[in-house]
Amino acid sequence: MAEKNYTVTGMSCAACANAVEKALNKNNDINASVNIATEKLNIEYDEKKYDFDKIRKIVESAGYGLVEDMTEDKKMELYQEKITSLKKRLILAIIFVVPLLYISMGHMLGATLPEFLNPKVYPLNFALAQFVLTLPIIYAGRDFFSHGFKNLVRKSPTMDSLIAIGATAAVLYGIYATFRIITVDPEAHMDLYYESAGTIITLILFGKLLEAKTKGQTSSAIKKLIGLQPKKAKIIENGVEKEILIEKLKVGDIVIVKPGEKIAVDGRIVEGSTSVDESMLTGESLPVNKKVGDKVVGGSINKNGSIRFEATEIGKNTVLSQIIKLVEEAQGSKAPISRMADIVAAYFVPIVIGIAIITGIAWFLSGSGLVTALSFFIAVLVIACPCALGLATPTSIMVGTGKGAENGILIKSGEALETAYKIKTVVFDKTGTITKGKPVLTDLIAYGNYDENELLKIAASVENDSEHPLAEAIVNEAKEKNIEIKPYEKFRAMPGYGIRATFEGKEVQIGNRKLMENRKINVEISQKDYDILSNEGKTPMYISIDNELAGFVAVADVIKETSKEAIEKLKKMGIKTIMLTGDNEKTAKFIAKQVGIDDVISEVLPYQKSQKVKELQEKDEFVAMVGDGINDSPALAQANVGIAIGNGTDVAIESADIVLIRNDLRDVAGAIALSKATITNIKENLFWAFFYNVLGIPFAAGIFYAFFNGPKLDPMIAAFAMSFSSVSVLGNALRLKFFKVK
């Protein structure tokens, strides 16, 4: 099964998105989801049966368009075209609706009309003038009619269908009344309803324009990220400086960046030193110092030194492109909380049409007359707003994930954003998460016939090619002391225990107490030293040669400056904290005490970490696992929410639901707080959307007028209310932009 994302065109409400989903999902081997806020189609399909053209034809059969691989520039161009088109159509409608309202209602307010339009003297002129003025307004709102009636014929009615039926009913009644003026009843000019049709279309065009503009603001985070990338870059070609388009950059090109310029792509500095502003990418406010050999990230700003760097990643492989991709995917995904709204939206429009018809018939049969029945019929149609329901969740998800990205918190899906606020227990890996992951060798104790330098040479030689941070500490110490590192043979890594290798004909083993116990090596001589160093928070590792204890080394990792504050923030939120580590119990408890962690689970092998998380979940704990994604990927995947600590460049950690780019543990609390704020915002939106429709539709149907002698809702007021219902939902979602992630 292949998974793709495409852009759907021509949608106007949640019912449209549902129609596209329905058309696609009725086919075997297709699983489709449409996000109305982003206009994105996420689809899984069998590549042997379907391709883009076949999928596009299915979407077109539902009345919509499908676009493949649309660039951001093209999206922006289409967005601006949509705004411009709506503005022109709204202006056209306003030009004609103003005189239409003046003619139809001005005389009621004492306004003077030309004699030839006097309804009492020339009722036909009065009616025909309104009819003529209504036609350009209908033209301005032509899309409502074309899309609305087409979808009605396809048995997938949308919001456009409601508008089209309501406005058409008003116009047809106006035409009927005009013929009555000609034939039998000059007094029919009293209720023409042309002004209702014209005003409904104008107000909804105005609402659509506001909605489009507001929706554009919800995706501002993506636009900011895209705006970080420069269009051109300066390279050295055959010894000559040359400016080229960024699309023409190749891996290996030497790029020149002067102070104040943006870094075009990812690379490694080969000449010069500087400080780089990465705040727009990582949320890190302070410039980061860079020198020869250091990585630079595309989209960051060179502050105060000229540098040359070799391009290592270009195009879609850059960190910036990956961040944009992750944010787009998150904004296009659906949160579980939206399912109820989606179900309601699927049946909403047909139900509203049914309610409108029943309302009209009931009022007509009650003896109130055709005009009153028509008024209630139209009011029900135009007040109903599936858009508010459809936009309630995705717009908040868009703004929430965008806000996270601006602060170095990459939330990969709407589900992760919704789930994070439920977290009650946070489990931390130690090395590289609570600590910096750059341990140093603090102690080396030799026993028997070995001296410290000889033992360090043996240990560094067999650990030289290991990627483990503890091995790196041993090798670095040997290099600092200029101790020769020699070749080894038969290297074997034993995760959770240590390593084994042959060095100069001798079997060397370096690892923890479990390794020594498994090999039945006596370590009693070292017990006192082991306890002292463990109690100081250091990690002791035994060294055996030919199955006899030769000594041990102790390695210490520095605790991150922000770890203690991060734990305090979580405790204030009522969240339990646990450290899960392969370290011995004494070392683990020492580190945990330093930062204030509640509980410790120590001496855990890498493959056991996910099982420990599962055991916590079985106790009805909602668990987040925080790690670096290196040896704790299964635990990240097992947790209800997997949170990976990045390093400013690694954002594609597959097993994580959330990636913290800044490598700052305080962002764990920030991600949870953002999730709570977003879910609260979604619930507010859903409440408003349901409350508006549940209250508005009965009000428009005349329930309060009939039974409580309440006010009667004019169709024009109903149209005004509908226009602003979706805008209010969007406006509420935009409040998240002011949320401070601390």
Name each region found by the language model:
Residues 149-154, 213-228, 395-414, 734-742:
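Juxtamembrane helix-loop transition segments at the membrane interface in multi-pass membrane proteins
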Residues 88, 300, 424-467, 497-578, ...:
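ATP-driven catalytic headpiece of P-type ATPases
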Residues 5, 31-49, 53, 57, ...:
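Conserved cytosolic catalytic loops of P-type ATPases
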Residues 91-99, 340-367, 377-385, 391-395, ...:
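Bilayer-spanning, highly hydrophobic alpha-helical transmembrane segments
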Residues 60-76, 128-130, 134-238, 248-255, ...:
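Actuator/coupling domain of P-type ATPases
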Residues 109-124, 153, 172, 403, ...:
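Membrane-embedded alpha-helical bundles of multi-pass transporters
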Residues 1-125, 137, 224, 240-241, ...:
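Flexible metal-binding regulatory segments at protein termini and peripheral loops
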Residues 2, 38, 411, 423, ...:
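Conserved ATP-binding TGD loop and adjacent catalytic N/P-domain core of P-type ATPases
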